[in-house]
Amino acid sequence: MGALTFRDVAIEFSLEEWQCLDTEQQNLYRNVMLDNYRNLVFLGIAVSKPDLITCLEQEKEPWNLKTHDMVAKPPVICSHIAQDLWPEQGIKDYFQEVILRQYKKCRHENLLLRKGCKNVDEFKMHKKGYNRHNQCLTTSHSKIFQCDKYVKVFHKFSNSNRHKIRHTSKKPFKCKECGKLFCILSHLAQHKKIHTGEKSYKCEEYGKAFNESSNCTTHKRITEKKPYKCKECGKAFNWFSHFTTHKRIHTGEKPYQCEKCGKFFNQSTNLTTHKRIHTGEKPYKCEECGKAFNQSSNLTEHKKIHTKEQPYKCEKCGKAFKWSSTLTKHKRIHNGEKPYKCEECGKAFNRSSTLNRHKITHTGGKPYKYKECGKAFNQSSTLTIHKIIHTVEKFYKCEECGKAFSRISHLTTHKRIHTGEKPYKCEECGRAFNQSSTLTTHKRIHTGEKPYECEECGKAFNRSSTLTTHKIIHSGEKIYKCKECGKAFRRFSHLTRHKTIHT
């Protein structure tokens, strides 16, 4: 048996195969490949670093490597069988990857290396090996159905058609239980396990079962011993890549720089997310309402608005909540805990938001002041947004009025003020809007949807701003004060109405 090499333990993906994996599965693949290579290095087996490892370490997509690595190095074919193998020179380029795979599968590596035969006997032996191998090549020659989008060939025309469905919006396979559609039958089969409860992948150590092999592999990694330990703080990791990233906390190293604003990051994923601030890209879209987000975690949190599920229940009164953090805040009503104290007057509150609203009474309405320009705001979130004006360079300038923006999406939206364009139209009443978010909010008038619920009384609203105003009723605070007579009001509209007395 020959010596073990990295290629023996490596797994390769084409572009379409790689795109079928979710983010968790892609990360799992990276970590497993990197760990396999490091184990070979530790055992003294791996001498040179494969291109695949370099690619994974730089967190690039590995499918690119496979195409170049395979196609750029054609097999050295025996001169006696070259004509049989390549009947048409024009087809050669399409089959190089296929032939390489078939040779590897049939274990006839000698056919790839030998260019000539010394005598007739040797040729007969060589030809015998070729005849056995030719059975595999027969199927390879039939792979003439090519995908137009990516250079991939297939045994049968039916396989080619099935593959091409991936590049179209067609999803012919439907789940009878929930109606969800899939472009590949195997994906439907995997999905059905959710309804049947089938969990065919079992952890032998703990007995826990999973419906996907990737979930089982991840579970095993979590439960097994963590071999990579940090000397600084003692924290251990089961992935070497996680360990490497963690060390940057202690060293302060931030190797990933944004080309737009110059900001540095210790993880490439953080840089990728940050770049969306400049491009305005929001790849994570809610299927229910169409709202888009630049982070998957934000979409996950948002989805809870649409589901009526309230898994977090109070043991005292039985009230249920969507988020565990909301339950934690609610419990303070029962135990009387008030952890948020006002430094001015000593008054305590059970919510930080209530304390912030209370502070306005001491500061005259705008407690959040920016030292750079002296401008003050009545909400911390508004101050945070304002800071961007000073910290982020505005690359995108309006040619009409000269106003500049830090995001191209903001400039695009702004331009509609000048053009009067309103591309987002309501199908119910025909009313048009210049922003998709405004249309989304408007649609709730027709659907009756009220996703913003008050944690105190359960009353729901179709706008977050209306909920914010409503919350003041529960706090009892009167944050809007008349400068003329000193009278205070809970709502800004009440103050505005009151001011007419003085004028």
UniProtKB/Swiss-Prot annotation:
Residues 4-75 form the KRAB domain. The keyword Repeat applies. Transmembrane segments: none annotated. It comes from the Eukaryota. A zinc finger (C2H2-type) spans 145-167, 173-195, 228-250, 256-278, 284-306, 312-334, 340-362, 368-390, 396-418, 424-446, 452-474, 480-502. Keywords: DNA-binding, Metal-binding, Nucleus, Repeat, Transcription, Transcription regulation, Zinc, Zinc-finger. Disulfide bonds: none annotated. GO terms for biological process: regulation of DNA-templated transcription. Pfam families: KRAB, zf-C2H2, zf-H2C2_2. It is found in: Nucleus. One of its GO terms (cellular component) is nucleus. InterPro entries: KRAB, KRAB_dom_sf, Znf_C2H2-type, Znf_C2H2_sf, Znf_C2H2_type. One of its GO terms (molecular function) is zinc ion binding. Belongs to the krueppel C2H2-type zinc-finger protein family. May be involved in transcriptional regulation. This is Putative zinc finger protein 730.
